[in-house]
Amino acid sequence: MAKKALIEKSNRKPKYAVRGYTRCQRCGRSRSVYRVFGLCRVCLRQMAHRGELPGITKSSW
């Protein structure tokens, strides 16, 4: 889990647009965040396994 201060800091509008970065909406993780879902890879995987994301299925071939 990310520190509350870092989550609050990321919610503020940066002085320069380049400084903005994405965080997971669920846990606050800053790395490996999928923009389409707004989730990190860990949360995305957990929610997909539980069937909480419509249209997402585990691939098998």
Swiss-Prot record:
Source organism: Frankia alni (strain DSM 45986 / CECT 9034 / ACN14a)
Keyword Zinc carried by entry: yes
Lineage, broadest ranks: Bacteria, Bacillati, Actinomycetota, Actinomycetes, Frankiales
Family: Belongs to the universal ribosomal protein uS14 family. Zinc-binding uS14 subfamily.
Cofactor mode of binding and number, as noted: Binds 1 zinc ion per subunit.
Pfam families assigned to the protein according to its UniProt record, in alphabetical order: Ribosomal_S14
Protein name: Small ribosomal subunit protein uS14
Single GO MF annotation: rRNA binding
PANTHER family xrefs: 30S RIBOSOMAL PROTEIN S14 (PTHR19836), SMALL RIBOSOMAL SUBUNIT PROTEIN US14M (PTHR19836:SF19)
Subunit: Part of the 30S ribosomal subunit. Contacts proteins S3 and S10.
GO biological process: translation
Keyword field: Metal-binding, Ribonucleoprotein, Ribosomal protein, RNA-binding, rRNA-binding, Zinc
Cited function: Binds 16S rRNA, required for the assembly of 30S particles and may also be responsible for determining the conformation of the 16S rRNA at the A site.
